[in-house]
Amino acid sequence: MATVTVNTLEFVSALRALIPVSKQATLYSGEKERNAATIAARITPAKKLALITGNSALGAVASVRIEQAVETGEREFCLYTDDAKNITSIFKPNKQNSEEPLRLEFGDQLDNENIMIAETHKAYGNTELLIGNLTEDAEITDTLLNDLYLSVNNPEAPESPSFNVIKIAAFTTASKIYGEAATRVTGSDAGRIRHLIYGTHLHGIIALDRGMEDSEVATLVSEARNTVLETMGNQA
């Protein structure tokens, strides 16, 4: 698929404008306000969606708020990153010991748990946008992947491209978790669909209602992509 250069914030803004309010679990644009605790607090607890930030300093602040939400039962799970590159842990309430959340290390086998995991990858100063998908018995086809994949390369550094990527990483419960950016993981165990779109540089965080269908998300992403490309064409 051809590579195009797109401004991350413009893409997020275009995507946000297309999402019906009824489908938005959380809506936040962090271009001016970069307070991770505020971001974390704005995530709708009832939707049980987690925040991932690609900035380790902000992530540490947000992690405290989210961990508190897990411990108090507001949130079902949360994700942590270490250096804006890899998710190292998943915290869920520990049913055997409610005072201590259960830690699952990155790469652990998941069994009979509805957990959404996605990887953030930082390269050459820029980051990825990612659509994570926990799906019920879904066939993730190359067509769907292509529909949801938008690569942004830095033309000034073709040998060491700086990029933002929108990709889909599909996995279900009892699937092995893989950290490579291009890895596609599929499984057959049941899990309710949940979607999270986020900007790891806090250009924008959009958490979609987990009831949205894959086709709806694919359409939104495609329309937003076309909107940005059309705008770029008009400016040329």
Enumerate the language-model features and the residues they cover.
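DNA polymerase processivity clamps
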Residues: 1-236
